[in-house]
């Protein structure tokens, strides 16, 4: 019985160590190379006669045909 308890305790210590190591790696801040900002977009209100209201449409800047 004491062998089973010893193995169980060893397994628990191993699992806690692996969890601590994983959390340490996951919580490290990523290297920041520059200021991040969202891509520019243009927002238009397009009238829809069928729906009886204006529909907001957003176009992203850039792309292969820009």
From Swiss-Prot:
Signal peptide, first to last residue: 1-38
Keywords, comma-separated and alphabetical: Acyltransferase, Secreted, Signal, Transferase
Subcellular location(s) of the protein: Secreted
Gene Ontology cellular-component terms listed: extracellular region
Major site of localization recorded for this protein: secreted
MF annotations from Gene Ontology: acyltransferase activity
Quaternary structure annotation from Swiss-Prot or TrEMBL: Homodimer.
Stated role: May have a role in host tissue attachment, whereby ligands may include the serum protein fibronectin and small sugars.
Family: Belongs to the mycobacterial A85 antigen family.
Protein name per UniProt: MPT51 antigen
Species of provenance: Mycobacterium avium
Name of the coding gene: mpt51
């Amino acid at each position: 019985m004491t062998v089973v308890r010893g193995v169980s305790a060893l397994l628990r210590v191993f699992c806690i160590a692996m969890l601590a190591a994983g959390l340490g790696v996951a919580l490290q801040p990523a290297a920041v190379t520059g200021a991040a900002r969202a891509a520019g977009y243009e927002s238009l209100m397009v009238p829809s006669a069928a729906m009886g209201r204006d529909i907001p449409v957003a176009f992203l800047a850039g792309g292969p045909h820009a």
